[in-house]
């Protein structure tokens, strides 16, 4: 199987988000990369499901709370930007201050 670089990046996000969710289920607080992976994964999948950019920008702020992550992580993540594939093409989705 030959994957293009973009497909490899998406696959890496899926694996990282899966690992993060498993750690979260064990009661662990998420670190910076785990938090970004979960948010990114949910945005990509939301786009695939047909949600709008505006809807995803709002949805991205509801995925994780300060209680879900290690101390200092919310202050480290100012924006999460992801290129997602929508039914009408690829668009950039930006979520500002995603962990509240």
Swiss-Prot record:
Naturally occurring in which organism (per UniProt): Arthrobacter sp. (strain FB24)
HAMAP family: Urease_gamma (MF_00739)
Enzyme Commission designation: 3.5.1.5
CDD domains: Urease_gamma (cd00390)
Name of the protein: Urease subunit gamma
GO MF annotation: an example: nickel cation binding
Gene Ontology terms describing biological process: urea catabolic process
GO cellular component terms attached to this protein's record: cytoplasm
UniProt cross-references to NCBIfam families, sorted A to Z: PRK13241.1, urease_gam
Subunit record text: Heterotrimer of UreA (gamma), UreB (beta) and UreC (alpha) subunits. Three heterotrimers associate to form the active enzyme.
UniProt keywords, alphabetically: Cytoplasm, Hydrolase
Keyword match Hydrolase: yes
Catalytic activity reported: urea + 2 H2O + H(+) = hydrogencarbonate + 2 NH4(+)
Protein's pathway: Nitrogen metabolism; urea degradation; CO(2) and NH(3) from urea (urease route): step 1/1
Pfam families referenced in this protein's UniProt entry, alphabetically: Urease_gamma
Main subcellular localisation: cytoplasm
Recorded family membership: Belongs to the urease gamma subunit family.
Subcellular location: Cytoplasm
InterPro entries from the UniProt entry: Urease_gamma, Urease_gamma/gamma-beta_su, Urease_gamma_sf, Urease_subunit
């Amino acid at each position: 199987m030959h994957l293009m670089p973009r497909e490899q990046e998406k696959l890496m996000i899926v694996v990282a988000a899966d690992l993060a969710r498993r750690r979260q289920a064990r009661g662990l607080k998420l670190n910076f990369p785990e938090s970004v992976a979960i948010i990114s994964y949910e945005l990509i999948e939301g786009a695939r499901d047909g949600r709008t950019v505006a809807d995803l920008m709002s949805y991205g702020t509801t995925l994780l709370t300060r209680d879900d992550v290690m101390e200092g992580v919310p202050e480290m993540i100012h924006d999460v930007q992801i290129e997602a594939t929508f039914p009408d093409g690829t668009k950039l989705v930006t979520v500002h201050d995603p962990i509240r």
